[in-house]
Amino acid sequence: ITCGQVTGSLAPXIPFLRTG
């Protein structure tokens, strides 16, 4: 699991909706 730019979460790294 890679944490790029998350959308729907204010904390990176957290894989909610990854766009990167």
From Swiss-Prot:
The lineage of its organism: Eukaryota, Viridiplantae, Streptophyta, Embryophyta, Tracheophyta. Keywords: Allergen, Lipid-binding, Transport. Plant non-specific lipid-transfer proteins transfer phospholipids as well as galactolipids across membranes. May play a role in wax or cutin deposition in the cell walls of expanding epidermal cells and certain secretory tissues. Belongs to the plant LTP family. One of its GO terms (molecular function) is lipid binding. Disulfide bonds: none annotated. It comes from the Eukaryota. This is Non-specific lipid-transfer protein.
